Amino acid sequence: MSITAERKTALIKEYARGGADTGSPEVQIAILTERIANLTGHFKTHTKDNHSRRGLLKLVSQRRSLLDYLKRKDEARYRALIERLGIRR
């Protein structure tokens, strides 16, 4: 269900703005998107797992907050990130 450390470091390298950048909104949103995708696949087989569904809703809310922040601060980076991740919003 969760993402591996190797996948997380790959996402950090792909979306980082600098060398060891792990805290930028782009990196955080990319990691959250990966976790959301994993949980969505989990619900295809475990439809009654309401405890994990609540966690999914929290992740989606957190990602939405970060996306709103990025849009408020730098709309060009926001649009580029949405394009790269394939999030339609």
Curated annotation (Swiss-Prot):
SUPFAM superfamilies: S15/NS1 RNA-binding domain (SSF47060). Keywords: Ribonucleoprotein, Ribosomal protein, RNA-binding, rRNA-binding. Pfam families: Ribosomal_S15. One of its GO terms (cellular component) is cytosolic small ribosomal subunit. The keyword RNA-binding applies. GO terms for biological process: translation. GO terms for molecular function: rRNA binding; structural constituent of ribosome. InterPro entries: Ribosomal_uS15, Ribosomal_uS15_bac-type, uS15_NS1_RNA-bd_sf. One of the primary rRNA binding proteins, it binds directly to 16S rRNA where it helps nucleate assembly of the platform of the 30S subunit by binding and bridging several RNA helices of the 16S rRNA. Belongs to the universal ribosomal protein uS15 family. Part of the 30S ribosomal subunit. Forms a bridge to the 50S subunit in the 70S ribosome, contacting the 23S rRNA. This is Small ribosomal subunit protein uS15.
